């Protein structure tokens, strides 16, 4: 898979950056990553992990729910931590849209858990990182768009369907051609 992606990247002149959770653990790290990407001459693609220990917190939330424990307090704690990350990273006017999305995702957690949609819960971390980094880049003067990989990645028999995924990605980014950076 990585060889195929590398070959496609080299052929098309794509530049892909990957930032893990520790690179996005706090507001200063988000701003540093945005500053680094802003300096890139090519149109970069960025793949991000959940910020800091967010995935661990979401996994603990899932485990607590599965043990029939009350999740209201750990969910409130996680919500506060993530909201603080957003407000520390962005000015108020830019943070508002990210907070709206974050609060929507967090409010859906109990329903997702009740219907055993744990992947939806776990996706929150990456969605937040992509949304927050794109907003941070835009705030620093680099047009960026956050993309949800679930909107274009297609799997067949637990393997990526590259043809369908490429078609869906092409359609998805057609409306975002002016963006300098795509964050997934």
Describe each model-derived feature in a short phrase.
Residues 1-184:
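Nucleotide/pyrophosphate-binding catalytic subdomain
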